[in-house]
Amino acid sequence: MQDRQKAQDYRALLLADTPLIDVRAPIEFEQGAMPGAINLPLMMDDERAAVGTCYKRQGADAALALGHRLVCGDIRQQRLEAWKAAYQRFPNGYLCCARGGQRSHIVQRWLQETGIDCPLIEGGYKALRQTAIQATWQLAQKPILLIGGCTGSGKTQLVRQQPNGVDLEGLARHRGSSFGRTLNPQLSQASFENKLAVELLKINARQTLKRWVLEDEGRTIGANHLPECLRERMAQAPIAVVEDPFALRLERLREEYFICMHHDFTHAYGDEAGWQAYSEYLHHGLFAIRRRLGLQRFAELTDTLDRALAEQLSSGSTDGHMAWLVPLLNEYYDPMYRYQLEKKAANIVFRGPWQDVANWLKAQ
């Protein structure tokens, strides 16, 4: 049987969606983790902080002794049971700490005492993180084609249909606009970058890749910003622009932001709390761009939004939302995107309705 005590083929681990039992403290995990990792800490945040302070003042031996005093008895047993359960659930998993040091080795030894031989990641999260950064830089050097178009043009759907398409907004859990958040919170910046790297590796591994197909994004998608190596390549990339009729764009936006988001909120929180969350979501989206709209126009559109919500609540109709969505597109989103697109006019290689762009992509 192959020795799995230590793993150094980091790309293979990432490509295989290898389960990781991440024994770092919760604060470390929240700052950055790999896709598929579960956080089962050896030490909680306060325990780690105390051990760190002890290390600085008294040295490594004293810090190690303190760690063993903090994680002993019932606490040790509870955490050991959690690691055992995780390994039984994921027998192909690996232990992972920050650098493949004391913490993962301690947990490995404790598990061995119970008869479980769980391998660990040599180099820990730091090694996996460096692999992800290097992979993104390397794969970003391949040719890129961008899909552009005004809000509601179906760009994301078009990207998702391409075998070489990378859904940046899906990875970021955000649709890019002030109304772009979803019910799933965004990942930390490092976790987003790690997830992007794994997606690039997977797509690249399953086909002969001529180029990436990406949506024309700004530097940020919600709270996440695109890696600079990718942004630099996107800035020079050719663009295919979707130009659909305004009415069709409105129907896409109605479905996505009013029908689907209302359904998602009520499904998650129940009718009453879900409606409140849905209303707050729309108000927050409008509030986020109040300065660009001007306070008077913002107040007018807010009143219109309130009336639309009242109509939707009483009758189920989303028609009232068009009274604030149409001017929002005409006065803010469309002029903003067209201005940005004009600066990249030399990069445009195709224009047309959604289906024409889809057909053009197939022919490339």
Curated annotation (Swiss-Prot):
Disulfide-bonded cysteines: none
Pfam families, sorted: Rhodanese
SUPFAM superfamilies linked: Rhodanese/Cell cycle control phosphatase
Domain Rhodanese stretches: 14-137
Enzymatic class: transferase
Catalytic activity: 5-methylaminomethyl-2-thiouridine(34) in tRNA + selenophosphate + (2E)-geranyl diphosphate + H2O + H(+) = 5-methylaminomethyl-2-selenouridine(34) in tRNA + (2E)-thiogeraniol + phosphate + diphosphate; 5-methylaminomethyl-2-thiouridine(34) in tRNA + (2E)-geranyl diphosphate = 5-methylaminomethyl-S-(2E)-geranyl-thiouridine(34) in tRNA + diphosphate; 5-methylaminomethyl-S-(2E)-geranyl-thiouridine(34) in tRNA + selenophosphate + H(+) = 5-methylaminomethyl-2-(Se-phospho)selenouridine(34) in tRNA + (2E)-thiogeraniol; 5-methylaminomethyl-2-(Se-phospho)selenouridine(34) in tRNA + H2O = 5-methylaminomethyl-2-selenouridine(34) in tRNA + phosphate
GO process terms (BP): tRNA wobble uridine modification
Single annotated GO MF: tRNA 2-selenouridine synthase activity
Keyword flag Zinc-finger: no
EC number(s) reported in the record: 2.9.1.3
Domain of life of the native organism: Bacteria
Xref: SMART domains: RHOD
Active site: 97
Alphabetized NCBIfam families for the sequence: PRK11784.1-1 (NF008749), PRK11784.1-3 (NF008751), tRNA_sel_U_synt (TIGR03167)
Protein family (similarity comment): Belongs to the SelU family.
Role summary: Involved in the post-transcriptional modification of the uridine at the wobble position (U34) of tRNA(Lys), tRNA(Glu) and tRNA(Gln). Catalyzes the conversion of 2-thiouridine (S2U-RNA) to 2-selenouridine (Se2U-RNA). Acts in a two-step process involving geranylation of 2-thiouridine (S2U) to S-geranyl-2-thiouridine (geS2U) and subsequent selenation of the latter derivative to 2-selenouridine (Se2U) in the tRNA chain.
Record protein name field: tRNA 2-selenouridine synthase
Species per Swiss-Prot/TrEMBL record: Salmonella heidelberg (strain SL476)
